[in-house]
Structure formats: structure tokens, C-alpha cells
């Protein structure tokens, strides 16, 4: 059974509701990279690590560059395994051994080959972001949080995922589903 055969949300954006109760996810926009009956995994796409650029990470890892290194900020993908790196990128780049399609023209790769591609060694993806850590949910946990109105969902687009206007991504994601932040209560619940 593939993720698309059920009520799974792989490839969609999660939008944190105000008052989520966890400062790690306050105003977060998370791209779900995997979601099935056993687990869910996603990367926050609007949490820059101030002062840490992709170029600086590549230098620290001693990845030699054939181009000017990108100054895009590294993102904090989530609270799990924060020392592990993940690259979200357009699907024009693929590393067959380690790239996973997320959908909507976006792939996820976590290998040294993609870092070399970012440094200009190989065919580079048209757009990309580097995130440290990920957000993870156990079986049924994300579904429960959605039922409790902790998260809204929307379709991703390249601007929301790869754009560098991180402070506005949350309000832009809400606008994409026809909601403004002023319309949302900080208190979740059901009637």
C-alpha cells in the first residue's frame, strides 16, 4: 500500500495552529516527507538557524566547491536528530540510491552526494534547502493532533518550501487556504 492509497499526507504542508503549546513548533510550517500507518516524518521549512549558512556547513564538512558557496541559511528541520542533515530539493536532481520523492516536484536526499551537488560537483537541483533534524510522529500521533486542531494542512508550492522569506511563510501558508492569522483562535478544540 502506498501513501497515496489512504488518508496519508505525504507531500503536504502542516501549518501549526496558534497556541500549539510547543515552542519548537510555534508558527511552524512543516513539509511532510513521509506519512503512513506507522509513522510520519517532516521538515520545518521556516525555521532558519541564524548565522549558519549552507556554504559554512559545506566548508565545515570539507566539501570542496567548484562554485561560490550558497549563503542560504540552514533550517532547523525539527527536534529529532538535530545533528543529522537533510536536503529538500526540486526533483530535477536525483541520487538514485538515496533520493525519495515527496511529491509535488520535491525530493528528499540525505547523503554526501547531494552535498557535493550543492557545492557544484554534479548537476545541481534548481532549488534546495538544507535542514538539521526532523519532526517525527509515532503511529496515529499526527492523525490525533490533526483531529485536535493542532495542525492545518495545505498543498505545497516552491515559494513556500524553498523561498527565503521565512518569517512570512506561516501567514502565507494560511492565506493559501483562505485563512488569516487574525481569524484563528489560540485555543483549539471541538464543539
Regions from the language model: what does each represent?
Residues 1-131, 135-191:
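A short aromatic-anchored loop/beta-hairpin motif
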Amino acid at each position: 500500500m502506498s501513501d497515496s492509497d489512504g488518508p496519508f499526507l505525504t507531500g503536504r504542508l502542516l501549518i501549526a495552529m496558534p497556541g500549539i503549546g510547543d515552542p519548537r513548533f510555534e508558527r511552524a510550517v512543516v513539509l511532510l516527507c513521509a506519512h503512513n500507518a506507522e509513522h510520519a516524518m517532516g521538515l520545518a521549512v521556516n525555521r532558519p538557524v541564524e548565522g549558519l549558512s549552507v556554504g559554512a556547513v559545506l566548508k565545515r564538512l570539507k566539501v570542496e566547491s567548484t562554485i561560490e558557496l550558497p549563503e542560504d541559511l540552514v533550517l532547523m528541520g525539527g527536534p529529532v536528530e538535530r545533528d543529522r542533515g537533510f536536503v529538500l530539493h526540486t526533483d530535477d536532481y536525483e541520487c538514485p540510491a538515496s533520493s525519495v520523492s515527496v511529491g509535488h516536484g520535491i525530493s528528499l536526499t540525505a547523503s554526501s552526494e547531494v552535498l557535493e551537488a550543492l557545492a557544484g560537483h554534479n548537476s545541481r537541483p534548481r532549488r534546495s534547502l538544507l535542514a538539521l533534524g526532523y519532526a517525527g510522529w509515532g503511529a496515529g500521533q499526527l492523525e490525533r493532533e490533526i483531529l485536535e486542531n493542532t495542525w492545518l494542512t495545505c498543498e505545497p508550492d516552491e515559494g513556500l518550501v524553498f523561498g527565503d522569506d521565512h518569517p512570512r511563510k506561516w501567514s502565507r501558508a494560511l492565506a493559501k487556504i483562505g485563512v488569516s492569522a487574525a481569524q484563528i483562535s489560540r485555543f483549539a478544540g471541538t464543539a
